[in-house]
Amino acid sequence: VGDVQSGFSVGQRVSVSPSRPCGGCKYCHEGLPNHCLNMRFYGSAMPFPHIQGAFREILVIESSQAHLLAPSTTLAEGALAEPLSVGLHAIQRAGGVFGKRVLVTGCGPIGNLLIGSLQAAGALQIVAADLSDSALACARRMGASETHNLKDEPEALARYTADKGYFDVMFEASGSAQALRDGLTCMRPRGVVVTVGLGGDVSIPLNLVVGKEIDLRGTFRFHPEFAQAVELLNRKVIDVNPVISHTVPVHQAVQAFELAGDKQQAMKVVLDFGVKDV
């Protein structure tokens, strides 16, 4: 712990934000730190040379990156502050979800943590769609009121298309262009669609976007939401434990990474470094 900082002491447990904006560029000054021109986000391949990751035994960080964990918050829960922050920023981009009907397509770790955040934010109804029964089971534990396996029932979302659509807000978290296209048919006029998981070029029915005045928005990373995520974890507002499918000792790290790559078995795999929670 450096001499020039205050508020932290040796032995305290913290969750570390990977977001490191410069604070001096035009976007930082405009309150858009996630779009910082000099961002040093851990593990980012966007700039060249690439930014180093943080998977190491010893890591020197800025004090602003450290967020204290409450005694009741486990290290495993603290490790999920980062993906939880992604969903919190997506909700901010949607402009609010209180009292609204929400569709979430894609129930991986990001999608399911997003569902937990939606429930905490007061969404009236949360409908989740995925191709995996285990992912949808996790979605129900995180707060989804209805789930649909589109592999078993490809036309399941058709029931929401009557009278120009049903949902006020949609979060597309699967990265599937087809999920985005199908979701647009379910949106009410002037609904908001936030693309969380899409990348690359896709084709969409622009006639639906125009004809129903749908607001299509992107979401990228986070910054202030990390502190909010840790606060929500510390206050037990959101239980992230259903997303932790496996805990593996660090000496079995290779097997843990292989397990994490098997989406049929794993959701979030936590490495146990043998450090006891308070």
Can you describe what each PLM-predicted range is?
Residues V1-K26, A70-S72:
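Glycine-rich beta-strand-centered segment in the early N-terminal region that forms part
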Residues R13, R101, G191-V192, D215:
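Short glycine-centered segments of the SAM/dcSAM-binding site in methyltransferase folds
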Residues G24-T105:
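NAD(P)H dinucleotide-binding glycine-rich loop of Rossmann-like/cofactor-binding domains
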Residues V86, I110, L118:
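Hydrophobic/small residue at the entry helix of a nucleotide-binding pocket
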Residues V104-C107, S117-D182:
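Adenosine-nucleotide cofactor-binding segment
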Residues M187-P189:
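Helix-to-beta-strand junctions that scaffold the AdoMet/dcAdoMet cofactor pocket
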Residues G197-E213, Q228-E231:
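Rossmann-fold NAD(P)-binding glycine/threonine-rich loop
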